[in-house]
A protein has these predicted regions:
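Acidic helix N-cap motif at the loop->helix transition within catalytic regions
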Residues: 6-10, 33-42, 85, 89
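Conserved donor NDP-sugar-binding/catalytic core segment of glycosyltransferases
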Residues: 89-121
Length: 263
C-alpha cells in the first residue's frame, strides 16, 4: 500500500473477517502519510494473523506485491489493493476452487465498481468494458504461490512503474502458458467479489476510455508496447523452460565427461 491511511482499515477488516485465512501481510511501499502508523495497529489487535512489512522507499506496486509473496509461506496467495475490499466468503471460495481444480494455477475474482463515474456505467457496452477491467487489474488475482514464484512474480520493470500494466503483462503470460479461472462469468457469483472503490486516477478508467470510447493513451509509444510484450514473452519462456526441466525423460544423476584442450 502507498499513502493509503484513509482506506487501509476498510481493506484489512474485509480480510480479517474471511474464513480460510492463514495470515495478512500488509506491505507499506514507502508511504509519506500515516499509513505505517495505521498499519501497525493491526498486529496488536490480531497478533497471530497480521504482519506489517515496511519497504524503505517507494518501489512500485509490483515490488510490494512480490515482497508480500516472498514473506508469506502460504500455498495460495491473494492480492488486495489497499483502497478495495473483499465481499464475504471470497477466500473460502478461492480456497475451494483451488482444491477442486488442482489444474488451475491462478484465479481472477469478480470486481464490483463502487462510486464509478456515471459516464462509464451508463455506456451501453459497459459490461463488455468492465470484463476487460476484471481481466486486467491485479487486485482481484489469486495464485498458487509456487506458480507465481516460477513466473518471477509481478514484473518490476521501470516501464510499468511509469505506465502501469505489470498485472497485464503477467496475466497475458499466464493465459499463454496455462489456465486462469474466472469467477465472474457465472451470474451466481456476483456476491463473491472484490469491491473496487473508484478514484479519479485509477488505471481502470484509462482502460475503459480505450475500450468504450476509443481513446488511446498518448503516453504509451510503440516501443513501450514492444517492451511490455517482451516482458510477457520472457515470462512465458521461463515457464516453458521450467516445464522442460521437470518433464525430462531421463531423471537423476547425469555424469559429465570433460575433455581439456591441449595446451
Amino acid at each position: 500500500c502507498y499513502n493509503a491511511a484513509l482506506t487501509l482499515e476498510r481493506a484489512v477488516m474485509s480480510v480479517v473477517l474471511q474464513t480460510h485465512l492463514q495470515h495478512i501481510i500488509i506491505v507499506d511501499d514507502g508511504s509519506r502519510d500515516h499509513t505505517v502508523a495505521t498499519a501497525q495497529r493491526f498486529p496488536a489487535a490480531y497478533p497471530n494473523k497480521i504482519r506489517v512489512a515496511c519497504l524503505p522507499q517507494n518501489g512500485g506496486v509490483a515490488r510490494a506485491r512480490n515482497w508480500g509473496m516472498l514473506v508469506s509461506n502460504a500455498e495460495i496467495v491473494a492480492f488486495l489493493d489497499a483502497d478495495d475490499a473483499y465481499q464475504a466468503q471470497v477466500l473460502a471460495f478461492s480456497h475451494a476452487v483451488m482444491q477442486f481444480r488442482p489444474d488451475l494455477p491462478a484465479l481472477r475474482l469478480g470486481l464490483i465498481p463502487v462510486d464509478l463515474d456515471a459516464k462509464y456505467s451508463a455506456h451501453p457496452q459497459f459490461d463488455y468494458g468492465w470484463r476487460h477491467v476484471e481481466m486486467t487489474v491485479g487486485g482481484n488475482m489469486v495464485f498458487r504461490r509456487a506458480f507465481l514464484l516460477a513466473c518471477g512474480g509481478f514484473p518490476q520493470d521501470e516501464l510499468f512503474r511509469r505506465l502501469g500494466g505489470e498485472d497485464v503483462a503477467l496475466g497475458l503470460a499466464v493465459l499463454a502458458s496455462s489456465q486462469m479461472g474466472t469467477a465472474f462469468d457465472d451470474v451466481g457469483l456476483d456476491e463473491i467479489a472484490v469491491l473496487h472503490h473508484c478514484r479519479p486516477d485509477m488505471y481502470a478508467y484509462k482502460l475503459l476510455d480505450g475500450v468504450l470510447f476509443g481513446l488511446g493513451r498518448s503516453d504509451i509509444t510503440k516501443a513501450d508496447q514492444q517492451e511490455a510484450q517482451a516482458v510477457t514473452d520472457g515470462i512465458v519462456s521461463r515457464l516453458q523452460q521450467l516445464h522442460q526441466w521437470l518433464h525430462t525423460e531421463h531423471k537423476g544423476k547425469v555424469p559429465l565427461k570433460v575433455e581439456l584442450a591441449p595446451k
